[in-house]
Structure formats: structure tokens, C-alpha cells
Curated annotation (Swiss-Prot):
Transmembrane parts of this sequence: none
Single Gene Ontology BP annotation: translation
Subunit and interaction comment: Part of the 30S ribosomal subunit. Forms a tight complex with proteins S10 and S14.
The keyword DNA damage belongs to this UniProt entry's keyword annotation: no
Record's function text: Binds the lower part of the 30S subunit head. Binds mRNA in the 70S ribosome, positioning it for translation.
InterPro entries, per the entry: KH_dom, KH_dom-like_a/b, KH_dom_type_2, KH_sf_prok-type, Ribosomal_S3_C_sf, Ribosomal_uS3_bac-typ, Ribosomal_uS3_C, Ribosomal_uS3_CS
Annotated Gene Ontology cellular component terms: cytosolic small ribosomal subunit
Organism: Helicobacter hepaticus (strain ATCC 51449 / 3B1)
Name of the protein described by the UniProt record: Small ribosomal subunit protein uS3
Comp. bias intervals (Basic and acidic residues): 214-229
Keywords: Ribonucleoprotein, Ribosomal protein, RNA-binding, rRNA-binding
HAMAP family registered for this protein in UniProt: Ribosomal_uS3_B
Region (Disordered): 214-236
């Protein structure tokens, strides 16, 4: 089950929080969900260059507060906040509601699963070899303090006629352990041969009520880091 389900949704209420944090009666819930979709779609398109990893939406009465978590917040704000004001006015015209936008800098962007997936997708679109792109992102995540990382790409890799799936894993990624803090990201690379899907799982430690458990040190005979990989061909 842990291999199939979204690891963030599986851990909601345990060590992860919702990205839409509001409550409404049943009559207004569908319209609120549609508004959240419009907000995320618009801001993702307008802020693609800033390395956005998450949009957190909160509601109070007829006001909407959006917190944007990005690796390069300065590009979103613009000179004297001009760019952010443009986004507010555009959303106000779309939703006919007052929208407040807060910018928050992403901590350790190299260990952020969504940013890592988008980084790999961008490299694939630039015709970088997929194995090189995967291993480069994995090394950066481990250096940034991740306990483990798993990367999977699916599609017509290297222009092959038959689609296949390949993945690499370094360290531990315990998807069945609910107290494990697992970050998950997904992105798509639009290549000349078709779409290549990229999935990234990053393990950041086990969480208890008192904090994060320290990682147990395991002595290795060889002393080298273990990197596992697997390839699987898809059906035509």
C-alpha cells in the first residue's frame, strides 16, 4: 500500500498538514475547491521561474490568504513589490474576492522533493542524459541532509521506441512507516519524444511528538554508499 498511495496524503494528520486549510458548509465546498484550483493554476503559470514548491491557501469570511513557498522569493516580489501587486489584482479579477499573498522562502531547496522533480524535468527537456540528471539531484539532496532519496522516471527514455521505467535509490526511504517524514514531488518533462514523468521521494527522518528521531549509524564493511537501481519496460 505504501508503494502506491501518495505519501503526503497517507500522513495527513500525523506529520503532514493540508495545503488547503479552511472549513465550509457543503453548499460552498465545491466552489471553494474550484477557486483553489484556479489560484494554484494561475500562480504556478506566473511564478514558474521562482522555484515554487507549495501553495498554502487559507480562508476567512470573504478573504483568501495564499502562502507561496519558493526557493527564489525575490523574483516573485519584484522591485518594490510591483510584481506581487500585479498577481493580487489579477486574482481579484478572476475570483471577485480580496486575495492576500505571502512569500516564504523554502528551506534547503536541494532536499525539497517537488523542486528536485522539477529540476530533473527541466534537465530532461534540455536533452541532458536522464541517469546523469537523476544522480546529480540525488547527490545534492543527500548533501543537503536527506536521510534517503528515491527517484523514478517513466516514458520514452533517451528516445527509445518502447516506454520503460527506471529508478534509483540512495539511503533509506521507508514508505510504510507512518512516523517517517516523507516528502514527495511529481513533475512532467515535455520532450520531443513525448512526456516523461518524474517522481521523487525524500526521507527526512522519523518524527515523534518530541521531535525528530536521530538516525542510527550503521557501520558498513565497504564504507561506500549503496545506490540501488531498477529498470522495467512498459507495455506497448
Amino acid at each position: 500500500m505504501g508503494q502506491k498511495v501518495n505519501p503526503i496524503g497517507l500522513r495527513l494528520g500525523i506529520n503532514r498538514n493540508w495545503s488547503s486549510r479552511w472549513f465550509s458548509v457543503s453548499q460552498t465546498t465545491p466552489s471553494n475547491i474550484l477557486e483553489d484550483h484556479k489560484i494554484r493554476k494561475f500562480l504556478k503559470r506566473e511564478m514558474y521561474y521562482a522555484g515554487v514548491s507549495e501553495f498554502i491557501i487559507e480562508r476567512a469570511a470573504n478573504k483568501i490568504r495564499v502562502t507561496v513557498v519558493a526557493s527564489r522569493p525575490g523574483l516573485i516580489i519584484g522591485k518594490k513589490g510591483v510584481d506581487i501587486d500585479k498577481h493580487k489584482e489579477a486574482l481579484k479579477k478572476i475570483l471577485h474576492k480580496e486575495v492576500f499573498i505571502n512569500i516564504k522562502e523554502a528551506k534547503r531547496p536541494q532536499a525539497n522533493a517537488q523542486l528536485a522533480a522539477e529540476n530533473i524535468a527541466t534537465q530532461l527537456e534540455k536533452r541532458v542524459a536522464f541517469r546523469r540528471a537523476m544522480k546529480k539531484v540525488m547527490q545534492a539532496a543527500m548533501k543537503a541532509g536527506a536521510k534517503g532519496i528515491k527517484v523514478k522516471v517513466s516514458g520514452r527514455l533517451a528516445g527509445a521506441e518502447m516506454a520503460r521505467t527506471e529508478w534509483y535509490m540512495e539511503g533509506r526511504v521507508p514508505l510504510h512507516t507512518l512516523r517517517a517524514k516523507i516528502d514527495y514531488g511529481f513533475a512532467e518533462a515535455m520532450t520531443t519524444y513525448g512526456i516523461i514523468g518524474v517522481k521523487v521521494w525524500i526521507f527526512k527522518g522519523e518524527v515523534l511528538h518530541k521531535g525528530i528521531l536521530p538516525e542510527k549509524k550503521e557501520e558498513s564493511k565497504s564504507g561506500d554508499k549503496e545506490v540501488r537501481s531498477k529498470s522495467r519496460r512498459g507495455r506497448q
